[in-house]
Amino acid sequence: MTKDRLSALKAAQSEDEQDDDMHMDTGNAQYMEEFFEQVEEIRGSVDIIANNVEEVKKKHSAILSNPVNDQKTKEELDELMAVIKRAANKVRGKLKLIENAIDHDEQGAGNADLRIRKTQHSTLSRRFVEVMTDYNKTQTDYRERCKGRIQRQLDIAGKQVGDEDLEEMIESGNPGVFTQGIITDTQQAKQTLADIEARHNDIMKLESSIRELHDMFMDMAMLVESQGEMVDRIEYNVEHAKEFVDRAVADTKKAVQYQSKARRKKICILVTGVILITGLIIFILFYAKVL
């Protein structure tokens, strides 16, 4: 009686544990499904940022190739930069939430899902930093091109300025420093100064944008650098696992081929034996009738 009751209690406990495991598996599956939806959303946002960076490059070229001040293109450029800034801040915030969740879950036992989340987070972070690095380079390149444009226009206006002096004039933030000592009695001279002031204004906007994104950029870059070794190790293991699987598949195919050949040999031997035995029986019967 006592043994039966103990068995019943153990069976009930086992059922409860199975129910808990099933509930946990279902919860993990749903969590990972939501996680991958978030990953795809972030990846899509980063792709949009990358596309907008390409549009920024086109706007830069259009502005610099236009001899007159193109206000419409500049407004479109300002809007693109604002869109990139908003999207980048959102992506950074979402990546930060994932990072915090991973750090929290690392306090417990590690599992395959946690490793997957780490890898996905690191891959997204790397991609994001690559795109933002390209954007930062685009801005600094445009600054140098604007600076070169100012230098050429100053030369046209007859004002010789060295590179260091020009840099100081730009950093002063005062467009009036460019007009000192320049006679603006012709339309061409006025147009030249207007272009200089426009390029200087562009540089001021660029530097403001670069400063705004600098902290975010450095934060993400440091995160990616710290994750680099882990990701490289994971990629190495995955690559070697793939090679192992490929070799295993090839070996399996060879084994199947050898097995198939061996099977065919056995069948041929069996058929030959049957034919010989049948012929022998027919010969014996025929010989018996003759006798």
Swiss-Prot record:
GO CC aspect terms: axon; basolateral plasma membrane; dendrite; endomembrane system; membrane; neuronal cell body; perikaryon; plasma membrane
Annotated phenotype, changing L9A: Does not interact with unc-18. Locomotion defects and resistant to acetylcholine esterase inhibitor Aldicarb
PROSITE patterns recorded: SYNTAXIN, T_SNARE
Stretches assigned to the Cytoplasmic side: 1-266
SUPFAM superfamilies: t-snare proteins (SSF47661)
Ranges where the t-SNARE coiled-coil homology domain occurs: 193-255
Entry-linked Gene3D superfamilies: 1.20.5.110, 1.20.58.70
Description of the deletion phenotype: Worms exhibit defects in locomotion and postembryonic development. All mutants are resistant to the acetylcholinesterase inhibitor aldicarb indicating impaired cholinergic transmission.
Biological process annotations from GO: calcium-mediated signaling; cell differentiation; chemical synaptic transmission; exocytosis; insulin receptor signaling pathway; intracellular protein transport; locomotion; neurotransmitter secretion
Renumbered residue ranges of the record's region Disordered: 1-24
Record keywords: Cell membrane, Cell projection, Coiled coil, Cuticle, Developmental protein, Differentiation, Membrane, Neurogenesis, Neurotransmitter transport, Transmembrane, Transmembrane helix, Transport
CDD domains xref list: SNARE_syntaxin1 (cd15880), SynN (cd00179)
MF terms in GO: protein-folding chaperone binding; SNAP receptor activity; SNARE binding; structural constituent of cuticle
Segments forming a coiled coil: 69-95
Compartment annotation: Cell membrane; Cell projection, Axon; Cell projection, Dendrite; Perikaryon
S-S bridge residues: none
Main location: membrane
Topology term for the membrane: Single-pass type IV membrane protein
Family named by the database record: Belongs to the syntaxin family.
Self-association and partners: Interacts (via N-terminus, in open or in closed conformation) with unc-18; the interaction is direct. Interaction in open conformation with unc-18 promotes synaptic vesicle docking and tethering. Interaction via N-terminus with unc-18 mediates the secretion of the neurotransmitter acetylcholine from cholinergic motor neurons. Interaction with unc-18 is reduced in the presence of unc-13.
Record's protein name: Syntaxin-1A homolog
